[in-house]
Structures are given as structure tokens and as C-alpha cells.
């Protein structure tokens, strides 16, 4: 029975495999090594945090919902009871000592689950929450680091986009430095030219002054040389006479 199920499943999956070899009885030849191929780009559906509802700790709720329209509310229980009695009556399942051991172990497991399942579940949930908190902290830290890296990258991109302003500033600074150097040299040349012109003016003034003094001395010398002794005596006598006349006039004037 089980071999037939395996063969039917293999035959169903065979058309889906590319370049699949001939399938032998119960043998499924894989065309590639699992867990080493290219991962699919389709997003995986999120796994549920909690499992679905079950009855009797084993049978899913969907099984009962599937049988309710066909068998009614008591149908699944009647079906289970009938199958159990059928297996026992036909000796498909034979009761052995292991059966009672299994019932005892299952009962013990059920008792432990009913007694301590809630506390164990809370403990496991607490461990899970702590692990989730740690993972969330790591996630937030990673997101913060990534966001900081993104902000730094944006800042660098903004600086790169504004680099022409930096070039303009450097160009203006160079032009300003050249202008300052030009004006300093121009002022230095102006001072040198002014000093030289002042020097030439001073030389010309000194030459004129020396020439005037020399001319005055030369004229005075020749005038003195041209005056004879008789003319000097006559001039002195005339000056003395003039002084006497001025003294008489001063004495003759009444005092106010």
C-alpha cells in the first residue's frame, strides 16, 4: 500500500522535473542537489506564529469542518469509533501488552500537558520573547547603522554635488591673491617712482639754490671790487651827512 503511494507520488512529480531520468520502482532521481541551487526571487509567505486548532490534541479542526456537511456533528466521532472497532474486529490491530504501555504513556503525557503545559508554555514564550527582543534590538541597531550610513552617503553626495562651489571659492581666492599681489607691486612701483621724482626735485632745488647763492656772491664780490677807495669815502661821508640831517629833523619835530 505504501509503495503504491510512493510510486504514484513519483509519477505525479516526474513531469515537473527537467531532464528527469527514467524513474525506477520507488526511486526518485533528483536533477540537482538540494539547498545549493539559485534561491527563488518570489517572497516566502510568513509563517504563522500559532498553529491551528486541534481536537483531542491530535486531529485538526479542518477535518471535522470537512465532515460536518456530510455526516453531521457526530459523524467524525462515529467514523473514528467505527474504524477503531473495524480494525479490532478484523484483527488489523491486535491488542498486545505494548498497547497498554502506549495507553499509559499517552495518559501520562496528557496529564503532564494538562498539569504543567500552561507554565511550560509561559516559560517557553518568555524565552521566545527574550530572544525576539534580542533579535529586535540587533535589528534596530543594524537599521540605525544602515540609516547612519545612508545619511553619511547622502551628505557625501550633497558635498559632491556642491563641489563646484568649492572650486569657485578657490578660484576667487586665487584671483583675490593675485589682485593683492598686483596692487602691492603697483604700490611699491609707485613709491619707487615717487622717491626718484622727489630725489630729482630735491636735486633741482638744491642746484637752483646753489646757483642763486653763487650768483649773489659773485655779484656782491664784483660790486665790492668795483667800488674804489674814493667812492667809499664819499659814500660814507654822504651817509654821515644824511644821518645828521635826519637827527636834526627828529629834534625839530614837537613832542605830542
Swiss-Prot record:
Instruction: Please give the organism.
Output: Rattus norvegicus
Keyword annotations of the record: Acetylation, CF(0), Hydrogen ion transport, Ion transport, Membrane, Mitochondrion, Mitochondrion inner membrane, Transit peptide, Transport
Q: What does this protein do?
A: Subunit b, of the mitochondrial membrane ATP synthase complex (F(1)F(0) ATP synthase or Complex V) that produces ATP from ADP in the presence of a proton gradient across the membrane which is generated by electron transport complexes of the respiratory chain. ATP synthase complex consist of a soluble F(1) head domain - the catalytic core - and a membrane F(1) domain - the membrane proton channel. These two domains are linked by a central stalk rotating inside the F(1) region and a stationary peripheral stalk.
What are the boundaries of the transit peptide?
Answer: 1-42
From the Swiss-Prot or TrEMBL record, give the protein name. Answer: ATP synthase peripheral stalk subunit b, mitochondrial
A single GO cellular-component term from the record reads:
mitochondrial inner membrane
Modification sites for N6-succinyllysine: 131
List every position bearing N6-acetyllysine.
Answer: 139, 154, 162, 221, 233, 244
What the entry lists under SUPFAM superfamilies is as follows:
ATP synthase B chain-like
Amino acid at each position: 500500500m505504501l509503495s503504491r503511494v510512493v510510486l504514484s507520488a513519483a509519477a505525479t512529480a516526474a513531469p515537473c522535473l527537467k531532464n528527469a531520468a527514467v524513474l525506477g520502482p520507488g526511486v526518485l532521481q533528483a536533477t540537482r542537489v538540494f539547498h545549493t541551487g539559485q534561491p527563488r526571487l518570489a517572497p516566502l509567505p510568513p509563517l504563522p506564529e500559532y498553529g491551528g486548532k486541534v481536537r483531542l490534541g491530535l486531529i485538526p479542526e479542518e477535518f471535522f469542518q470537512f465532515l460536518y456537511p456530510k455526516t453531521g456533528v457526530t459523524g467524525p466521532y462515529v467514523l473514528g469509533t467505527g474504524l477503531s472497532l473495524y480494525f479490532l474486529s478484523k484483527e488489523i490491530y491486535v491488542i498486545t501488552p505494548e498497547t497498554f504501555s502506549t495507553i499509559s504513556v499517552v495518559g501520562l503525557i496528557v496529564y503532564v500537558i494538562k498539569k504543567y503545559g500552561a507554565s511550560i508554555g509561559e516559560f517557553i514564550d518568555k524565552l521566545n520573547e527574550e530572544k525576539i527582543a534580542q533579535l529586535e534590538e540587533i535589528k534596530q541597531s543594524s537599521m540605525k547603522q544602515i540609516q547612519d550610513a545612508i545619511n553619511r552617503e547622502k551628505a557625501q553626495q550633497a558635498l559632491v554635488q556642491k563641489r563646484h562651489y568649492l572650486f569657485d571659492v578657490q578660484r576667487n581666492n586665487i584671483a583675490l591673491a593675485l589682485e593683492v599681489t598686483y596692487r602691492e607691486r603697483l604700490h611699491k612701483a609707485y613709491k619707487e617712482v615717487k622717491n626718484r621724482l622727489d630725489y630729482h626735485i630735491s636735486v633741482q632745488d638744491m642746484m637752483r639754490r646753489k646757483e642763486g647763492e653763487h650768483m649773489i656772491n659773485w655779484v656782491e664780490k664784483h660790486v665790492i671790487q668795483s667800488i674804489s677807495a674814493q667812492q667809499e669815502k664819499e659814500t660814507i661821508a654822504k651817509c654821515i651827512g644824511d644821518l645828521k640831517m635826519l637827527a636834526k629833523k627828529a629834534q625839530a619835530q614837537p613832542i605830542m
